[in-house]
């Protein structure tokens, strides 16, 4: 049976995972599953707004309401607010506590259910909450040491993800700015007209029709599209007589056009 040191090493090894390896929809499902296996419990991770980032159900908690939390990927506002007031780990909370993960209607089904809440911090900020629970059996001191380590590890990962997202946003903005600076006034006018034709981020358009409507030549539109495509802002595909299919890859172009 793994001892505390071995379990700690398993948890800290999570930090070796690249941010790029995180899932898109529930980025911390794998992490929650790993924590659930190591600590022997159910686990979920929510951000500061109560959005579900990942969960693992090692033991079935047969309540429709808990399952609804995971299906909608959002915890109730009242619960999120109560959890946000937990500044240090609260361990072995009974089914009578407001922070129990067990809904009121399941108290008789899981009278010995226990919940542990651990705040997640990163860079001095509250980033979310780690919630673990069992249908019975208290979390031991060793378990709680692992919980503290787990919340720290998750905090570092969340902070890394925020940093990655910020860097990606800045990169995209820089690319858009550089591309816009290469466009003439007529080409900017063409780009604005083209993107207004799209249904969301993609759609079909006919360059000659747009050119006639805004009073420019078709070549201006073609040149503008080439510049945006070479910058990785859009993708285009000829549809022959039906026109051109266009898809926006870098949505920062929309914000930039608002300034035009």
From Swiss-Prot:
<dbReference type="GO" id="GO:0003677">
    <property type="term" value="F:DNA binding"/>
</dbReference>
<dbReference type="InterPro" id="IPR036390">
    <property type="entry name" value="WH_DNA-bd_sf"/>
</dbReference>
<feature type="region of interest" description="GAF domain">
    <location>
        <begin position="1"/>
        <end position="159"/>
    </location>
</feature>
<comment type="similarity">
    <text>Belongs to the CodY family.</text>
</comment>
<dbReference type="GO" id="GO:0005737">
    <property type="term" value="C:cytoplasm"/>
</dbReference>
<dbReference type="Pfam" id="PF06018">
    <property type="entry name" value="CodY"/>
</dbReference>
<dbReference type="InterPro" id="IPR013198">
    <property type="entry name" value="GTP_trans_reg_CodY_C"/>
</dbReference>
<dbReference type="InterPro" id="IPR029016">
    <property type="entry name" value="GAF-like_dom_sf"/>
</dbReference>
<dbReference type="Pfam" id="PF08222">
    <property type="entry name" value="HTH_CodY"/>
</dbReference>
<dbReference type="InterPro" id="IPR011991">
    <property type="entry name" value="ArsR-like_HTH"/>
</dbReference>
<keyword id="KW-0804">Transcription</keyword>
<dbReference type="GO" id="GO:0005525">
    <property type="term" value="F:GTP binding"/>
</dbReference>
<dbReference type="InterPro" id="IPR014154">
    <property type="entry name" value="CodY"/>
</dbReference>
<protein>
    <recommendedName>
        <fullName>Global transcriptional regulator CodY</fullName>
    </recommendedName>
</protein>
<comment type="function">
    <text>DNA-binding global transcriptional regulator which is involved in the adaptive response to starvation and acts by directly or indirectly controlling the expression of numerous genes in response to nutrient availability. During rapid exponential growth, CodY is highly active and represses genes whose products allow adaptation to nutrient depletion.</text>
</comment>
<dbReference type="GO" id="GO:0003700">
    <property type="term" value="F:DNA-binding transcription factor activity"/>
</dbReference>
<keyword id="KW-0678">Repressor</keyword>
<keyword id="KW-0963">Cytoplasm</keyword>
<keyword id="KW-0238">DNA-binding</keyword>
<dbReference type="InterPro" id="IPR036388">
    <property type="entry name" value="WH-like_DNA-bd_sf"/>
</dbReference>
<dbReference type="GO" id="GO:0045892">
    <property type="term" value="P:negative regulation of DNA-templated transcription"/>
</dbReference>
<feature type="DNA-binding region" description="H-T-H motif">
    <location>
        <begin position="207"/>
        <end position="226"/>
    </location>
</feature>
<keyword id="KW-0805">Transcription regulation</keyword>
<dbReference type="InterPro" id="IPR010312">
    <property type="entry name" value="Transc_reg_CodY_N"/>
</dbReference>
